[in-house]
Curated annotation (Swiss-Prot):
UniProt xrefs under InterPro entries: Amidase, Amidase_CS, Amidase_dom, AS_sf, GatA
Keyword Transit peptide: no
Any single GO CC term annotated in Swiss-Prot or TrEMBL for this entry: glutamyl-tRNA(Gln) amidotransferase complex
Source organism phylogeny: Bacteria, Bacillati, Mycoplasmatota, Mycoplasmoidales, Mycoplasmoidaceae
Protein name: Glutamyl-tRNA(Gln) amidotransferase subunit A
Purpose: Allows the formation of correctly charged Gln-tRNA(Gln) through the transamidation of misacylated Glu-tRNA(Gln) in organisms which lack glutaminyl-tRNA synthetase. The reaction takes place in the presence of glutamine and ATP through an activated gamma-phospho-Glu-tRNA(Gln).
Organism whose genome encodes this protein: Mycoplasma pneumoniae (strain ATCC 29342 / M129 / Subtype 1)
Subunit: Heterotrimer of A, B and C subunits.
Length: 478
């Protein structure tokens, strides 16, 4: 089973002194790719100071990684991709960063993202676009754009992102890597800037499923500091499970209505997949999931997530912390001061989404819109999770087509449909979901395969993903 982490660890074990040349090499790669805007902060110097102190027995010891810049790092600027927090240095670290730090992993950079995670293209950071790793005219997907870029270009063997609607799995699909979102609450969100707390997940990028399992063993741990934390029945056993024999006598479901949205090329690849896994001994189950539910996934997602977001960031006033146009004692009007600060330092996309969220939670609209959206979400989740009573896993393309150009997205051309929206169901339900490389037309035109399991079946999901990964045999360019 392929693993970049183990390969690198073997080199470091044989030649401990090779850590310094490795970090210098990464520093050079970061500088070479700096114009792609995938990083907001180069922390290689921090890693160089940390490496000699590491004594961990973890497979991640002295393994470099990149962290999405909405995850707090004590003493290191954490912007959330927003000009509002351009100079903000957290006095604490997120639990997920502390766990990685304790494992000996070395932070070499803070990754760019759509502002506070509210975006799916990589074009809405306060610090400029993130470009596709293999074609600067294309979008990389978002919001965890920089984290995906770093892994796709081989700069680091793994990175950490966040996934509220598909923000790990969509860029993984576009960048031809693995993106894993575990069951809700298994990776602590303590110290992670929120977008929509009922939907937010921390996720992992890597080139191979085995590396995702290695990282999962280190960061899927119950955290009392996270009120939404849940305990995994398989914590610490994910890597070990991939070495066990895999029973291919499984039931794999798919949503039949989505096939109508496939283009010719995607349909051909999809039919080939169904034939292959049937030949391998799996049972395929077509589900006629209600079309009326699929059609409202995206509006329900937007209403709930934007409403939660506007509440989460109500503390960004510029009065206590964050950027400000002038000092509070110079302000003549409190409300006007906050409005001026937000207008100046928030991006246009963020402001539009906050307006929608404020509208949905207004006292005159709450019952009509937000409360109704929550009820529809419940109906969706019940219908979706019921599928796992008949199937062990549910598969789907991770996108309806290849990624689009930056120019096309800026023009507002529609480029998603129900196939793309399907990924959001795993955030509504909180079940584990993974994207693995699958359809490769050329290195800048790829579509991943989404594999989903029932809640707390993360171990089984990684097992089937590793098996499918071996079937597909996708090669990576450095």
């Amino acid at each position: 089973m392929k693993s970049q982490i183990l390969k690198l660890q073997q080199t470091l074990t044989k030649k401990p002194a090779s850590i310094n040349p490795l970090l210098q090499q990464i520093d050079g790669a970061i500088n070479e790719h700096w114009s792609s805007n995938f990083l907001l902060k180069n922390t290689v110097e921090w890693a160089q100071a940390q490496a000699p102190k590491n004594r961990s027995k973890s497979p991640l010891n002295n393994i470099p990684f990149v962290l999405k810049d909405n995850i707090a790092t004590k003493g290191i600027v954490t912007t959330g991709g927003s000009r509002f927090l351009e100079d903000y240095i957290p006095p604490f670290s997120a639990t997920v960063f502390e766990l990685l730090n304790n494992s000996g992993a070395l932070l070499v950079g803070k990754a760019n993202l759509d502002e506070f995670g509210l975006g799916g293209t990589g074009l809405h950071s306060g610090f400029g676009f993130v470009h596709h790793p293999w074609n600067e005219t294309l979008i990389p997907g978002g919001s965890s754009s920089g984290s995906a870029y770093a892994v796709a270009r081989g700069i680091v063997p793994f990175s950490i992102g966040t996934d509220t609607g598909d923000s790990v799995r969509r860029p993984a699909s576009i960048c031809n890597i693995v993106g894993f979102k575990p069951t809700y609450g298994l990776i602590s969100r303590n110290g992670v800037y929120p977008y929509a707390p009922s939907l937010d997940h921390v996720g992992i990028f890597a080139r191979y499923v085995y590396d995702v399992a290695l990282v999962s063993d280190e960061i899927i741990k119950h955290d009392k500091a996270d009120f939404s934390a849940q305990k995994s029945p398989d914590a610490g056993k994910f890597t070990r499970s991939l070495k066990e024999s895999f029973n291919k006598q499984i039931k794999i479901g798919y949503l039949k209505p989505l096939e109508e949205w496939f283009d010719i090329e995607l349909s051909k690849k999809w039919n080939s997949l169904k034939e292959r896994i049937t030949l391998e001994g799996c049972e395929l189950i077509p589900f006629h999931f209600p079309l009326e539910l699929l059609e409202v996934i995206d509006p329900v997602y937007k209403l709930i997530s934007y409403s939660e977001a506007v509440s989460c960031y109500s503390n960004l006033t510029g009065i206590v912390f964050g950027q400000k146009l002038f000092e509070p004692n110079q302000a003549s009007d409190f409300s006007k001061t906050i409005t001026a600060n937000r207008d100046r330092f928030f991006g246009e996309q963020l402001k539009r989404r906050f307006i929608i969220g404020a509208f949905g939670t207004d006292k005159n609209n709450f019952t009509k819109y937000f409360e109704k959206a929550q009820k529809i979400r419940r109906v969706m989740v019940d219908a979706y999770l019921n599928l796992f009573k008949e199937a062990d896993f549910i598969v789907s393309p991770s996108a309806s087509g290849f990624t689009k150009t930056i120019a096309a997205v800026q023009k507002g051309e529609s480029f998603t449909n129900l196939v793309d929206d399907f990924l959001q169901l795993a955030n509504f339900a909180g079940n584990p979901s993974i994207t693995i490389p699958w359809l490769v037309k050329q290195k800048d035109q790829t579509i991943g395969l989404s594999v989903n399991a029932n809640c707390f079946h993360d171990k089984q999901l990684l097992q089937v993903a590793a098996w499918l990964e071996e079937l597909f045999q996708i090669e990576h360019d450095d």
